[in-house]
């Protein structure tokens, strides 16, 4: 059982932005609880309080107590918590400690000094339960996003923890990989594990969650049964900043047509990361309208990121690209293109959001910076370290800063 007893937490001296206030919450053994809410509302902090990253790793001001089966998280060493709570994060790469899948599955057991025979038995059982025989003996760098998340789920459960905590595990996955993730969650639920998951993408959790908790400004504002949550009107859901609980409720956005005859043309747009390897990108010819919003879709590993890197000039030798008849080499594309990466932590360089803005503009007047931040609802975070922003706030802030 997980028990929050009047818990408040803020990062450093910050009183807002990802912290929580006066949270009282009991999650019973075997219960599946979904945390949802807008980016920066405090969902991730709640998960960190359960797996012990707060306060053992992330420092701040903590009041109240979190109990796991009667044991205080604050008083329990992380190595003991690791056997009690399994964690799966938004970016599985952030929790890998080894370069191959076999070693990754063995790592937690080895770290706690389990006998070799026991480790091998646990790995064999985990591989069988998760149907990942084809992923064993592989480099983690050669796995697709969905395959990495499978290994993350498997490695986090080798110790047989009774509690599983997940923080937006589907954010980088395609439909097929999300379906695989749902099957893992279903397995955990059948095994009687207590599951706490923070998510924006909700449809795949339909019929799995026992309770839905809506978090706003660091507080659990509302609690729903799945039926109550599913019955929310579109207007109410949009006011709450939430996605639909069912794909059948998705509606197309308003159509927009750019009034321009300009075209972006691709000729022999091909790329391979290494010589003698199959091409990751092969576009003999294509035309796209300039001035429109275009979605590049496809399965994990299909070449979407490679295409974006080539368009932006991050890869040099990839064929011909013309805009309105003018050829743009890779240097010209670097000047005219901006790219927001999957993990925007790689693109944030300074000690504060204010300094990050100053990197992007010629004017060093902080009043100009404040005006920009206010325009995009980022002013309250001006003195925060960019890497301390939530997973949803980082790409939003970087996108606005590049503009």
Describe each region flagged by the PLM.
Residues 139-143, 147, 385-389, 393:
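Conserved ABC ATPase signature
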Residues 199-200:
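H-loop/switch region of ABC-family ATPase nucleotide-binding domains
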Residues 1-4, 9-22, 54-59, 77, ...:
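A short, flexible loop at the N-terminus of ABC-type nucleotide-binding domains that lies
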Residues 117-135, 366-381:
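Conserved ABC ATPase "signature" region
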Residues 51, 312:
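Helix-to-loop junction immediately C-terminal to a conserved catalytic motif
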